[in-house]
Amino acid sequence: MSLDVRVIAPNKVIWAKNAEEVILPSQSGMLGILTSHAPLYTALNTGVMKIRNETGWTSIVVMGGFVEVEKNEVLVLVNAGEYVDEIDLSAAKKDVEKALETFNSAEAPKEKEEAAEFLKYAQARLKAVVDK
């Protein structure tokens, strides 16, 4: 038996395949999902999720969101996401620099909050590429 896993961002379906295991960056730490997991609804942090299927592990950087687990179906809704293997190291470094500049120049609380989220995502992307 396997999990039916879907990872969906507003602009694309990132993953829609079966898997044996999913590891997610939840608000309370890393969360592992295996078949027959109890029903679950929880918020996700920005970070790297991992999916294991018959070909091995796949890593996806996600920018927050939510996960719903029920009856071996895992629905992950994220604000943004991309495969770690598709991230260019030099571009990721530049994105961190740009996000840091945006954060430092933001003045209004809402701007600062949004800039902080993008900085966190940029840093997660860079860390994921460096760690792979």
From Swiss-Prot:
The gene is atpE. GO terms for cellular component: cyanelle thylakoid membrane; proton-transporting ATP synthase complex. It comes from Cyanophora paradoxa. The keyword Thylakoid applies. Produces ATP from ADP in the presence of a proton gradient across the membrane. HAMAP family: ATP_synth_epsil_bac. One of its GO terms (molecular function) is proton-transporting ATP synthase activity, rotational mechanism. This is ATP synthase epsilon chain, cyanelle. Its main location: plastid.
